[in-house]
A protein has these predicted regions:
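Amphipathic alpha-helical "lid/sensor" segments that cap RecA-like P-loop NTPase cores
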Residues: 4-60
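Accessory nucleic acid-recognition modules appended to NTPase machines
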Residues: 41, 45-190
Length: 190
C-alpha cells in the first residue's frame, strides 16, 4: 500500500517474481485479457495471449461443438461459418436483450452471411439450436428474467454472457470501449 496524491491508499500487489503492480493496472489487464488460468503461465504479451485464446476458442468450438454433433449423429450444427457469426454476434452483444429473430435479422441486414454456405436468413429454430449448443458447451450463459411474485420466467428477451471476457475481446479484436457491458459480464460471473 502507498498513499496516492489525493490522500487515499493505493493497493499494490507483488507477484511471485517480486514484480510490483498497481491494483488498477491488474484490473485493466483482467478486463482486457480475461482470467483464463494459462495466462498466469504465459504472461500478458498480446501475441501469446492471442494464441492461447485462439486455442481455447478452437478447442471449445471445433472439438466441443462441431465434433460432438458429428459423434451424436444429430447433425444439427453443420454450418461452421454460421456458428462463428452467431458467436460473434453474442460476443458483441453481451448484456443486451437478444432473440434468435434479432440475430437472424442482423446477420442478413448487415450482409454477414455472404461468406458462408447460407445466403438467406436462417430459421429461428436453427439459430436457437446453435445458441443451445453454445450454452451446452458453456461458452455463453443465458439469463432470463424471473417474476418473483408469480414465480415464473417472464416472456421477455434473455441476455447472454460469455464465459471469459478475454475470449470476447479476442473474438472482437481487443477493441477499446464498451466498458459497461464488459463490467456487467464480469460481475455476472462473480
Amino acid at each position: 500500500e502507498r498513499k496516492s496524491p489525493a490522500g487515499g491508499v493505493r493497493k499494490r500487489i507483488t507477484d511471485a517474481d517480486g514484480e510490483v503492480y498497481d491494483a488498477k493496472e491488474l484490473f485493466d489487464a483482467y478486463t482486457r485479457f480475461g482470467g483464463m488460468p494459462m495466462l498466469a503461465d504465459i504472461g500478458l504479451e498480446i501475441d501469446r495471449v492471442t494464441a492461447a485464446l485462439d486455442g481455447v476458442y478452437s478447442a471449445a468450438v471445433v472439438n466441443d461443438i462441431l465434433e460432438r454433433e458429428k459423434r451424436k449423429g444429430q447433425r444439427t450444427i453443420t454450418d461452421a461459418v454460421l456458428l462463428r457469426k452467431i458467436i460473434m454476434f453474442l460476443a458483441d452483444n453481451i448484456g443486451n436483450n437478444t432473440s434468435a429473430t434479432s440475430i437472424g435479422n442482423t446477420l442478413v441486414n448487415e450482409g454477414l452471411l455472404e461468406d458462408g454456405k447460407r445466403k438467406t436468413k436462417p430459421a429461428v429454430q436453427t439459430i436457437q439450436a446453435y445458441i443451445g449448443a453454445l450454452t451446452e458447451a458453456y461458452i455463453f450463459y443465458e439469463i432470463r428474467r424471473f417474476d418473483i411474485k408469480g414465480k415464473e420466467y417472464l416472456r421477455t428477451l434473455g441476455k447472454y454472457y460469455i464465459v471469459d471476457i478475454g475470449l470476447r475481446n479476442f473474438l472482437l479484436g481487443f477493441r477499446e470501449g464498451d466498458s459497461g457491458h464488459i463490467l456487467e459480464n464480469i460481475i455476472f460471473f462473480e
